[in-house]
């Protein structure tokens, strides 16, 4: 009986190892959404720069952190201030989406568009919370431009009454470690 049990255990272990080995040879399929999400993960760390005007705009700090076992990238804008905002980037049903927790008290959601490239992620409004209609003021679109590994520009389009009324721009550089 012990021999049969040991043989069965060894056979089960061998079968499991064979399955793992077979899968290990497969390359995970990559999608534009997954590639873009991986690019966001590379932003991890502290970034400093300007909001508004590249030279004279107000100082801005942004912290990027990968969280939730690698399934979410958290962007904290103006950390520790009364105007602190958080944007969470994550994959949902194979699409890269974001939820922006705005100082205005609403939470617009956006999805990566087909216009996105490896150097520029383009997001557009798909809904949100505390926004009763598209006429309510909210962030409606966002673009992140990667300039090498240590520079980033982002633009956030604000919509009011169904049309774009402002674009918030950020010019950031990675804090040296």
Give the positions of each predicted feature.
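Sec/Tat signal peptide C-region and signal peptidase I cleavage site
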Residues: 20-23
């Amino acid at each position: 009986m012990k021999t049969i049990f040991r043989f069965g255990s060894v056979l089960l272990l061998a079968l499991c190892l064979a399955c793992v080995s077979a899968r290990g040879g497969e390359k995970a399929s990559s999608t534009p959404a997954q590639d873009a999400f991986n690019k966001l993960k590379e932003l991890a760390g502290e970034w400093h720069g300007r909001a508004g005007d590249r030279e004279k705009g107000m100082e801005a700090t942004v912290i990027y952190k990968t969280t939730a076992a690698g399934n979410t990238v958290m962007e904290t804008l103006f950390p520790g201030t009364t105007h602190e905002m958080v944007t969470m980037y994550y994959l949902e049903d194979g699409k890269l989406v974001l939820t922006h927790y705005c100082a205005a008290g609403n939470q617009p959601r956006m999805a990566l568009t087909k216009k996105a490239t490896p150097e520029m992620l383009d997001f557009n409004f798909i809904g949100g919370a505390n926004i009763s209609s598209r006429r309510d003021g909210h962030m409606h679109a966002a673009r992140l431009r990667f300039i090498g590994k240590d520079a980033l520009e982002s633009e956030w389009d604000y919509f009011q009454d169904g049309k774009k009324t402002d674009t918030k721009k950020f010019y950031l550089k990675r804090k040296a470690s």
